[in-house]
Regions:
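Active-site phosphate-binding strand-loop segment of PLP-dependent enzymes
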Residues: 1-80, 85-87, 92
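Active-site region of PLP-dependent enzymes
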Residues: 51-57, 64-144
């Protein structure tokens, strides 16, 4: 530890982020991980790809850190044929994610001005409809798992 930073012993670099994974629907020891991350100002990104709908202490996995990442690939508990989402309570990250995932378009009279490299990470309507229908039945899918 140096200046209240957590240091990687092999690289001697400051650990800036941690990405714990909730595997097969089972929450990891997120309380312990979050406590360490909070103590050393480490950014916490949860990999909740395999735990959509899982709860830990009555709170959804993916909602303990700064950002939670979820997957809707074909092998997950609910699927849209692909895609995923992130969840956050941080307004800055929410706006940044939306901006980047919608081609980084900014309001402009030509309607095609971009302020940075953007991506088209939006689900097609058909895939989104499939996902929405499954989200409504998420509890049933979890009970049958």
């Amino acid at each position: 530890m140096k200046n209240n930073n957590c240091i990687n012993k092999k690289t001697n670099k400051i650990i800036k982020a941690c990405m714990p994974m909730h595997t097969y629907g089972f929450p990891c020891r997120i309380d312990e991980i979050k406590k360490i991350c909070d103590e050393y100002s480490i950014f916490l990104i949860e990999d909740a790809a395999e735990s959509v709908g899982s709860l830990y202490k009555n709170k959804h996995t993916g909602t303990f850190g700064h950002i939670g990442a979820m997957s809707f690939n074909g092998n997950k508990i609910i699927t849209s044929g692909g895609g995923g989402c992130i969840v956050t309570n941080d307004e800055y990250f929410a706006k940044k994610a939306k901006h980047l995932s919608t081609t980084s378009k900014i309001p402009h009279r030509w309607d095609y001005d971009h302020d940075t490299i953007g991506y088209n990470y939006r689900l097609p309507n058909l895939n989104a409809a499939l996902l929405f229908a499954q989200l409504e039945r998420l509890d049933d899918f979890i009970d049958n798992k």
